[in-house]
């Protein structure tokens, strides 16, 4: 995997940096694990905008990823590595000994032809999924479940991981890259290793149009609007003279947004607020 800086033949290519991986499969995705994906444009069923800055984008299809890794004690072979337009990480197509095919997240260091396995009896190696209680201190993990059987929800993006800090009765303490330290139930599954494609954050889009290909519309500053459109709008000069707020007047810096108090007991150290 290399970074390719484009020649400055046009103003946009002058700043474009691409991530090139020659090991990725260049054909179509596996048909039985692919389904259509409709565009919403950020609108709900009434046609009203519920999420701003969404619209356009290139057509894409959704790849069904196996986040649960619930096919235990059966060896699978990595057939190929693929690009996935729906996430920052790449994916791997694996074939089980009974013939079933599944997509999983590509772990860093996973190669074509490698064997992977899931279950409590699986060895601790790159790409294998086990209950988190089986991993020793200092282990690097990704695709970590919060509820057993629900599927991995933590550390799924490119280059992300969590580290096992200690074991505590029925829980395992892990540290996330954000700095958060939290408790995970010991029966939850996790995959050994970190997510691949860690160079993803080093690329440069080069032009605004590249963001439009991804379905991201422009974000207009509140100070550039009129008073009718935003609390920061209007006035002479650039200073809006008040605490930063959202377009609806809600405090936008420093306000806590987490509402699920029931699960706060599992967060030992918050990434923003010391506990």
Curated annotation (Swiss-Prot):
Residues 253-262 have a biased composition (Basic residues). GO terms for biological process: cytoplasmic translation. Pfam families: Ribosomal_L2, Ribosomal_L2_C. Coiled coil: none annotated. GO terms for cellular component: large ribosomal subunit. Residues 221-275 are annotated as: Disordered. It comes from the Bacteria. Keywords: Ribonucleoprotein, Ribosomal protein, RNA-binding, rRNA-binding. GO terms for molecular function: rRNA binding; structural constituent of ribosome; transferase activity. One of the primary rRNA binding proteins. Required for association of the 30S and 50S subunits to form the 70S ribosome, for tRNA binding and peptide bond formation. It has been suggested to have peptidyltransferase activity; this is somewhat controversial. Makes several contacts with the 16S rRNA in the 70S ribosome. Part of the 50S ribosomal subunit. Forms a bridge to the 30S subunit in the 70S ribosome. HAMAP family: Ribosomal_uL2_B (MF_01320_B). Belongs to the universal ribosomal protein uL2 family. This is Large ribosomal subunit protein uL2. It comes from Wigglesworthia glossinidia brevipalpis. The lineage of its organism: Bacteria, Pseudomonadati, Pseudomonadota, Gammaproteobacteria, Enterobacterales.
